[in-house]
Structures are given as structure tokens and as C-alpha cells.
Amino acid sequence: MLHVSASKGMTEYFKNILDDVSNLYNLAEECRKNGYDVTDHVEIPLAKDMADRVEGIVGPKNVAERIRELVSEFGKEPAALEIAKEIVEGKFGEFGREVGAEQAVRTALAVITEGIVAAPLEGIAYVKIKKNSDNSEYLAIYFAGPIRSAGGTAQALAVLVGDYVRKNMGLDRFKPTEDEVERYGEEVDLYQSEVTTFQYQPKAEEIRVAVRNISVEITGEATDDVEVSGHRDLPRVETNQIRGGALLALVEGVLLKAPKILRHVDKLNIEGWNWLKELKSKKEEVIEELEEENDEYNYEDEEDLSQYEDYEVEAVTKFIGEVIAGRPVFSHPSKKGGFRLRYGRSRNTGFATDGFHPAIMYLVDDFMAVGTQLKTERPGKATCVVPVDSIEGPIVKLNDGSVLKIDTVEKAKQYTDEVQEILFLGDILVNYGDFLENNHTVLPSSWCTEWYEKILKSQNLEYTEEFIKNPGQKEAVNYAKITKTPLHPKYTYFWHDISKENISTLRSWVIGGKYNPSNDSWELNYDPEDEEISNAKRYLELIGCPHIVMEEKVEIFEYYPFLYSLGYDFDEKRDMIDNIDEKLQNTKNNMHFINTIAPFEIRRNAYIYVGARMGRPEKAAARKMKPPVNGLFPIGNAGALVRLINKAVDEGKTDEIEIANVKCSCGKVSLYRTCPFCGNSVEPTGPSRIKLPIKDYWYKTLENLKINKPGDVKCIKGMTSKDKIIEPLEKAILRAKNNIYVFKDGTTRFDCTDVPVTHFKPVEIHVPIEKLKSLGYLKDIHGNPLENEDQVLELKVQDVIVPESCMDYFLNVSGFIDDLLEKYYKKDRFYNVNTREDLVGHLIIGMAPHTSAGMVGRIIGYSNANVGYAHPYFHASKRRNCDGDEDAFFLLLDAFMNFSKRFLPDKRGGQMDAPLVLTTILDPKEVDGEVHNMDSMWEYPLEFYEKSLEGIAPKEIKKMMETIEDRLDKDSQYEGIGYTHETSKIDEGPPICAYKTLGSMMEKTSAQLAVAKKIRATDERDVAEKVIQSHFVPDLIGNLRAFSRQGVRCKCGAKYRRMPLKGVCRKCGSRLILTVSKGAVEKYMNVSQTMAEKYDASDYIKQRLEIIKSGIDSLFVNDKRKQVKIEDFFK
């Protein structure tokens, strides 16, 4: 029986996945029983839910059922505390006091993080019971760097759990000395200056208050080489180095998440945390209304002018504080002409991914491809670019002065080379759920067709769908006049972007024109030398009114609504306003003025412009270690720098390697559990250094595989795991044969950017309809039988659409697994695939780097975009949102057959990014809670748009909005999720981000600034200065410092912090090489100075670059020596 609520169809879907998982698991078990692998069983336990994952990752044994009971009864956080209490009480076995406390904290943290992230394993080093100066005992939690993967809230709750455990163990509170209190403050400052900045910069007094009041010691391992200089050698602090994990738990946990902790404290009735109320909570963004203009108004009509208030929001500049070279700024904060905020969700947006018109993706010189990350002004910190062509596209000015709306990709490609200026970037489609998740004020909506249609519906007016989408000019004007409704959004221009005086100037020029029947346009005389006409022409551009410039004439084709908006009756060819100067004087602002002279209501087109800059480019590439290798078979330095085992064999080289081994009864050294030379079962013992018989293993492996001449096979130098147990060489050779690479845990992976999709068309994923039917896709979203490739289907929650390149790579991986089955395990081939379509329906694992739990998925097709499409639930099951991060896919059978915990590095963080447990069925309740805020409506209500004008908190309107949270524990949690905006093609747009195709840094920065130059909402001089200050200068200074502190290395792999006295490698006698080259130090010097001059950077920046250059020259340039005579000194 399934443990989730689902319809009959979804139940059948899950049953098929479970059956396929079971079949693959059994096949892998049969293979492993042969004794050719590290263990005789599959090392990835299957988990049906969060409780199974927790028990599988951190234990203790038999805890899963109790977790289910507690979560069902109390909820996640209370259950975590109760399970911690029961562990220290000995209900799951007798532990020592410290061991029990550590187990309790780990298990509770695992419950809080849904048993997915690695933090409970790797983020907590250990827990100790220590003594205060008065000899009382207290609890100390030692945090490590990977605690970051838990997120701020979970980090804070880990401390809360520690306090709860302390109380239940009868321990006293932590009583810090003044030196210990001040030590935290010193470490926080040092961490931010030498390592990296925190999300939240706490004041010194906040740190003191927190440390004095938190009842457990937040401490940890040394994570960075930087040492404190003041509060050193403290008896209870084991290191003088920075404790990064402890600082994360304190600053980004307790201090940053103080409001959330207080909510949990109040809810759970935990005492001792009221001091948090004294700390200042983070400031929320609020809408600030501009003060009224100083003009004198005449309010004789006593009309309500509140609708004409000027709106401004406080610009959020944090996203643009750092600009990376080669990655363009598309819009400065809240700058006119930037991305216009529009509410809604398309089938490929939501969950931190925003929609953009595909035309703008081409017009910014291909710097926006599907999956490209943008750092955004609001509502969150970042988003992912995806195409939505049903929203407003960009408006551009061409070289000849014409202004066009670019509403198709074809137009964008046609006019790209002719664009002089991008006047308006188009819409950014953001769903309500992202505002709810970020607790960001719901800002005023732009004037859009969906809002307009809601108004018409509310008044029971008749209209057609075609009228809403694309009304004729006269039709729109007449409809507005007759029905007393606002003018259609299509003909509503950006009047608010120019002043009322500018509108008046524009009006005077426009009314002086005439109708041109041959072109069906309104024709204006245009003389660019005439200042007044030139200004009026600019105002025409700024309001976004399309027009063509031809032979000293300006032709306006949308003349009918445009003229009426300016108070000119086209039909009667007369000015409807007699006293324009009086109207100008007596109106409050631009929108009041335009509404006074127009015969209908004109809404404000845009309230909010959103700033954005490029973050990371999209990614779709095979996961490779550095350097890439085919297998986890160590050969030391025998393969030279290229690490080729073929080379070692051909040259007869070997090396001494620390490795698990045993001498077999046949007299040979066996590195495996089955001796490759005689077939006896043996058990390699703990690692020891031996001269590896590389040649013997090479030829024996080729004989076993019946391969004569394999290609190049790259191997590792040595194992970093605890037991140094290795992978059979056969696997490395077969991977090389199939041109694939191995990761640290024995799996073969493909990384790609996470992008959400809830619905798709068969044509988008290159899969025949009959194949989709066999996978359970029988009807489209309207309930019609699936018959053609353009129907829209709802994606099943564990199905994924991989990139085309991933499909090709997995063809190679499947070939490797089939070869492994046939040649090594002597089994029948399993996949037998020849085409991409053959892989459709096969199972994969999806996994994020910061986690230790995988999620089973099923391939249903591939796209042309370099991203991994999956249901938002699927991404959330990996504890990810979709703001530009990348995760991995790998074939399920590959993981079952080749993964081993015993390959994992024996160091902090070594167990991250490894499938220590595998979730088979996706339960929406047990995924990252962010996805629960995603809205699932087919349309937003009229009240939403009206409330948005008030700048309301998102929680205050939640009742009128349906989100995923409202569907949990119902059959509808998996099906029937809606979206508000259609898109023609989910992978429309440039195939690859321009950043990845450009060569040198000079090319990248030139392209970056060329984009900035043509975007109205961007200041290229400011971009150039920010690139120099935030990227080039820190890099130059850092590399200069690194050069002066560098060590040396040898080609044999030996590294020295300082040059040995002999001047050569002590290991092999070879010449030593510098680790930081001259080129690395000065690589950005020329491009920085060129940019500073070209874009007239400030004198401060130019002088700073000169100082850095003189520092570099002092290292690498000899001072010129001039021969002088003694009499020269007497001149």
C-alpha cells in the first residue's frame, strides 16, 4: 500500500516505478553476489519516506516507525524534539552520555531537514559534555563547515535541539568567560574580511548578547587557516583558527533566523529564549510613496486623486553590489525601462524561476539562454531564465530612429543587428508564491490583459477572446468609451515615464500631424536638428509608442488610440481640449494629466521595474573529477601527469601506493575480494604501502574482458578513502571504451541546471505519442485523448526531461553497464539501447551536491535546452529551488552496481553528494517547504490585482490564492496543478549563453559593456566601474598576495610550502615549479586599465589601478640602470 494520497492513475504510476526499482535492485544484488565488488550487496538502502531516510542516514536503528508516529501526531519540529528526548532516555538503546547526546542532536536535525541534506552527518562534528568554571557540566555542539547545507533555519533549530537535549539530560547552561564572548566577535569580523561575507552582518553587541544567553556552547572545528590574533589559546577553545561551522550556526542560524526561532519557541513552550526578542529583526522592504509635487493644484472638481499618486519603491541595490566581468547588467535597480513586474505562472516557471519573453533573450546578444541565472532585485535574490512568449516583449529603437515592439523571436533575429537602444526590456513573470516565500510585499501589478479581462468579467460585459488578446485600434477605443472601462493594455503606453510637461510638448507636435491614407498612419514632420521636435520625438520613444522614421517623417500606425489618449478626436479631426495650459497647471502629475485630456480612463502601464544582472551561465555537462578519470584504480605517479595506465604499462613503470591488499595463497598480491589470478576469495586488509604490480593487473584484466587494444584509460593517483579499497580495473577500462568518466563514489553523473516544468508538449521532448501513452500519458490537460504532439500534458512528479547532450551521454553509460554485465559479471545485457528514444522510460537518480539522499526519477524525453527539466516537487525533493543551481542525474542501475560508501573520501564533507539512501516515492509533504508556497491557480482573482496596489503583505491575501500547501494530503496534490500564462515552446531561446562562447576576458567584457550601452535601463560607466572594483581589483590584489606567499610543486606531485634548500624536489630530484605564475598575477591588468580609460572611470579607480600596476612591476620588471659619471653628481 502507498503511504501517500493519490488517484488511481497516479497509484498505478508509483507502482510501476516501485516495480522497476525492485527489478534493478535485484539485478544489481545478483551481480554483487559474485564477489567482484567491494561488498556482496547493494549499498544504497531504499526509503519510502522521510523516517526511512533518517534511519538510513544517521540512525539509530528502529527509529523510523516512532518518527512516523510523532510527525503524524505533532508535526515535524515537535517530533524532532521528542525523538531527541527519547534517544537520551535510552528508548532506542543504551548510549554513553556524550554518544547519546550526539545521536539525539543528529537524529533531530535529520528530521528537521527531511533526511535529505548531509548536515546531520557532516555538519555536526561531535557533541561533548564539558565543564564550566564552577565545575557544573554543560553541552557543547561542535559544528563543521557542511552545516551550511542545512540552511539557516535548520542551523538555528540544531542549537535549539541542543538546548532541549541539555535540559533533558539535567545539564547546566554554558557560562562563557568574557574572553570567550569576545572571541566570537573577533572570529566573525575575521571571517568576513578574510574568508567570505555572511548573509547577515551582525553588530558586536548582538553577538555578545547571543553568546551570553545561548545555553549550549556553539563551537566547532577549524575550517580556515586564518588565525585570531587577540583572544588566543583559550582553555575551552581547542583552536586559534576560525571555526566556520560555529559561526554559520550563530550568525546565519540563531541571529539571522531569530524571528523563526521565536515562533518555534512559543509554539513548543521552550523556556530561556526570550532574550531573542531584544534583538532587532531584519528590516522588511516597504513601499514608500513619494511626497506630493510642489506644483499648485486646483481642486475645484473635488475629485478623488488617490489613483494618480506617484508610486516609488525603495530600490534594492544589493544584487548589483558585485558585478562579474563578462556577465552583463540588464537593468540597474528599479530603473525605468527595466523588466516590468507581471504576476503569474507559466508551465515552466515558479519555484524561484521567472519568465521572460524569448525575444529579449536574443536582443541582449544571447547572454540570456534557457537556464541562465540572473541575480535579481526582487522578490528573491536570484532566478533562472525561461521563455514565456505570452507576456510583453521588448520595445527597441533602431539605428534609423524607428521604434518597434518585438513580440516574436523571428522579429528579434531580424532586427538584432539594427538595434540602437532597448527602450523597454519586456515583462518578468513572477508568481505570487515567490513573494510569499520571500515574505516580500506584494507590489502593484502592471496593467496587463489578465487584469483587464477580470474587470470586464466583474461588470458582466461581453467580449471575445480575440479582443482580449489582440483588439483592433478603433475597437479598443470605442469599447473603452462605450463601456466606461479603462483603455486596453495593448494601447496603454508608458505615460508615467515622462513628466506632464513632456506629454504636453509631445501633444503639440503630434496634433500638428496629419493622416496618411496610403500608409494608414498618422504622419509627423521630423527635423532632428529642431530641438523641440527632437525632444518630442524622444518622449514618443520613452512612452513606448511604435513608429517608423522615413525621409524626415515619423509614421505612427497605432494612431487611433494614441491620438484619443492625447485628447484629439481623429474621426472629427479636432482637438478636444480647449484649455490645455489650464489642464496642465491644474493636474497633479503625468497620469492625472493624461486622464484629464483623454475621453476614457488610462491605467498606469508599469508600477515596478525590476533590476537584474547575469549570474551563472546555464550548465549541461558530464560530471568529471579534476582531472577526469575513468576509474578508481590508483597508479600513483606511474602514469605521469596524464594519469594514463596504458603509458605506465608501456613504459614498465610502477609506483609505491598506500592501498588495501592481501597476499593470496597463489602467491600474488590481490587488491580485490576475489583474487584476479586464481579466483580464490580473499579479504584485503587495512591499507599498506606496496609496489603496485600494474602490468600484471593490466594484462589480466584485458584477458578477463577479452579486449586486445583498449583506448587510453585514465586512473587516479591514490585513494582518499579510509580503508583505501579500490574499484576493479575492469570498470575503468569499460568506461574508457564507452567514453565516460567516474565520480568519487563510483557513479557516472551528468550535471545540469534545475528548471521547473509542470506541463509539456510531446513535440518539445522528441518522443512519439505511442511511447508516451505506454508511459501513462493518455489525456491532455483538458481531458481529451492524446492524439497529436502539440497537446499540453501534465508532467508526472517523478518524470524528468533531460538535455539532449545528457541523453547522448547516458547512451554511453548504458553501453558501459551492458558491457559490464556481459563481460565482467557474465550476465545478459540490460539496456540494449541504440537511440535516444530507447532510453525513454528508464530510471535515474536525481541528487543535489549538498545532500546525501537521492530521488528516483524516470526519463520521458529530452529538450534542446541545456537544463534539466523536472517537476517542482522533484527539485524540492533534493532540497533545491530553481534559482540557477545545478544538480546531477545518474542511471539507477549504475548507482546500484557501482556505488560504494567505502570509496568516499575520509575527510569532513566526504559523505556529501553521495546516495547514502534513496527515496523511491515522492511525498509532497516531505520535500522542501518552499514549493508549498507555489501557487497552483489557472487565474488570479481581480481582488489580487486591486490589493496589489495597496502594497499588502503576501500572507494577508493568501486566503484568496490557492497554493500547493492547500492540496497536500489530497489526490489533487499530484494532479490538476494550474498555470496562468501559456508559452509556445519551453526551450525557445539562444541554445547557449554567449558568456560560454566568447574567448578572452577582453572579448567577454567588451560584449558585456556593449549590452549595457544599448539598454536604456543600464549605465555602462557604472557597470565598468563595478566590474573593476568588485572583480578585477580584488583579483589583482589577491593574486599579487598569493604570488608572494606561494609554495612550489614538482611534476611528481610533491608540494612544498617553501623552496627546499637544495632547490630541487626532495622526492625525485626534479626541477620545482611555481604554483602561481606571472600571467596569473597580471592577467586582468591590461583589460582593467583599458576599461577605466574607455569608460572614464573615476580618478580613484584609475589611481588604484596605477598603484597595483606599480606593485606588479616591482616584482617582475627590473629597474632600468643608467651608467653615470662622477661629475653627474655635481651638476
From Swiss-Prot:
<keyword id="KW-0808">Transferase</keyword>
<dbReference type="GO" id="GO:0006261">
    <property type="term" value="P:DNA-templated DNA replication"/>
</dbReference>
<keyword id="KW-0540">Nuclease</keyword>
<dbReference type="Pfam" id="PF24844">
    <property type="entry name" value="PolC_DP2_central"/>
</dbReference>
<protein>
    <recommendedName>
        <fullName>DNA polymerase II large subunit</fullName>
        <ecNumber>2.7.7.7</ecNumber>
        <ecNumber>3.1.11.1</ecNumber>
    </recommendedName>
</protein>
<dbReference type="GO" id="GO:0006308">
    <property type="term" value="P:DNA catabolic process"/>
</dbReference>
<keyword id="KW-0378">Hydrolase</keyword>
<dbReference type="InterPro" id="IPR056172">
    <property type="entry name" value="PolC_DP2_cat_dom"/>
</dbReference>
<keyword id="KW-0511">Multifunctional enzyme</keyword>
<dbReference type="InterPro" id="IPR004475">
    <property type="entry name" value="PolC_DP2"/>
</dbReference>
<dbReference type="Pfam" id="PF03833">
    <property type="entry name" value="PolC_DP2_N"/>
</dbReference>
<comment type="function">
    <text>Possesses two activities: a DNA synthesis (polymerase) and an exonucleolytic activity that degrades single-stranded DNA in the 3'- to 5'-direction. Has a template-primer preference which is characteristic of a replicative DNA polymerase.</text>
</comment>
<keyword id="KW-0238">DNA-binding</keyword>
<dbReference type="Pfam" id="PF24846">
    <property type="entry name" value="PolC_DP2_cat"/>
</dbReference>
<dbReference type="GO" id="GO:0003677">
    <property type="term" value="F:DNA binding"/>
</dbReference>
<comment type="subunit">
    <text>Heterodimer of a large subunit and a small subunit.</text>
</comment>
<dbReference type="InterPro" id="IPR056171">
    <property type="entry name" value="PolC_DP2_central_dom"/>
</dbReference>
<dbReference type="InterPro" id="IPR016033">
    <property type="entry name" value="PolC_DP2_N"/>
</dbReference>
<comment type="similarity">
    <text>Belongs to the archaeal DNA polymerase II family.</text>
</comment>
<keyword id="KW-0269">Exonuclease</keyword>
<dbReference type="GO" id="GO:0003887">
    <property type="term" value="F:DNA-directed DNA polymerase activity"/>
</dbReference>
<keyword id="KW-0239">DNA-directed DNA polymerase</keyword>
<keyword id="KW-0548">Nucleotidyltransferase</keyword>
<keyword id="KW-0235">DNA replication</keyword>
<dbReference type="GO" id="GO:0008310">
    <property type="term" value="F:single-stranded DNA 3'-5' DNA exonuclease activity"/>
</dbReference>
